[in-house]
């Protein structure tokens, strides 16, 4: 298997296959779940809005893909600083059956100088997840922009108990970048290598995915790169990976996540 095909296969098995669109419907989520059981194997998870968790669970079970985890989003996409609402949404997501919750860090409050609300929100949402769901925290690196802010936000999230730190919502102009990824993974290495990393948005093909995988291996080691600690958040990536692996045609360039 070529290096590119190897990267494509690994990326597929590490993917949180995502639909987070305003026009999502039950049928679109059913279709997404069916895609998660691909000709080249299962994706790690699907990532959907909370209201679709029951239909996703039912569909994955029916198609023999119950091992695909269900991730959802809370405090999304704006990262407000109302802890009570973020916790209520997270608790509801877990009650609905989410295996993983991707919560948005209150990055604007943080940029305005309030570190405490971010720490408190992540800590409270982690408590709401208990031992039932992983907590993945989106720090919105494309808005933070500065290395020092990306580094500090990553540190706060890890200190507050995040299971993963994630670059982006996919709802702002700049999503995952290699520069932000390096900073975040360096913080993980320094503070707690059990914490996972998820680049989201902007990972368009096997070559780009391979760059992130190589960087993760360089910083944290080959053994670290598994679905337990590394995911790609993506929607259009899957078709490109399947084409690289010989399943279907390469898609036209698509924008967005």
UniProtKB/Swiss-Prot annotation:
Look at the named UniProt entry and state the broad enzyme category this protein falls under. Answer: lyase
Q: Entry's SUPFAM superfamilies?
A: Aldolase (SSF51569)
Which residues constitute the catalytic centre? Answer: 102, 166, 198
Where, subcellularly, is it found?
A: Cytoplasm
Cross-referenced Pfam families, in alphabetical order?
DeoC
Alphabetically, the GO molecular function entries are: deoxyribose-phosphate aldolase activity
Q: What does this protein do?
A: Catalyzes a reversible aldol reaction between acetaldehyde and D-glyceraldehyde 3-phosphate to generate 2-deoxy-D-ribose 5-phosphate.
Q: What is this protein called?
A: Deoxyribose-phosphate aldolase
Organism expressing this protein natively: Aeromonas salmonicida (strain A449)
């Amino acid at each position: 298997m070529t290096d590119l095909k190897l990267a494509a296969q690994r990326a597929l098995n590490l993917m949180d296959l995502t639909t987070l669109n305003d026009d999502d419907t039950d049928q679109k989520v059913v279709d997404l779940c069916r895609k998660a059981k691909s000709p080249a194997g299962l994706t790690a998870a699907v990532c959907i809005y909370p209201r679709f968790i029951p239909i996703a669970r039912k569909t994955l079970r029916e198609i023999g893909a119950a091992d695909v985890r269900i991730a959802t989003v809370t405090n999304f996409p704006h990262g407000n600083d109302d802890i009570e609402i973020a916790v209520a949404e997270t608790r509801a997501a877990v009650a609905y059956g989410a295996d993983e919750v991707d919560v948005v860090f209150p990055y604007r409050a943080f940029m305005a100088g309030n570190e405490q609300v971010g720490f408190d929100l992540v800590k409270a949402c982690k408590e709401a997840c208990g031992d039932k769901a992983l907590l993945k925290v989106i720090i919105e690196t494309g808005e933070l922009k500065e290395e020092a802010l990306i580094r500090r936000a990553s540190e706060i999230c890890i200190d507050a108990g995040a299971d993963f730190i994630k670059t982006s919502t996919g709802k702002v102009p700049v999503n995952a970048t290699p520069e932000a990824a390096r900073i975040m993974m360096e913080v993980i290495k320094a503070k707690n290598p059990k914490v996972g990393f998820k680049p989201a948005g902007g990972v368009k093909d096997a070559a780009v995915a391979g760059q992130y995988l190589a960087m993760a291996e360089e910083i944290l080691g080959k053994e670290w790169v598994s679905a337990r600690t590394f995911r790609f958040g993506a929607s259009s990536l899957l078709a490109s990976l399947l084409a690289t692996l010989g399943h279907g045609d390469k898609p036209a360039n698509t924008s967005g996540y």
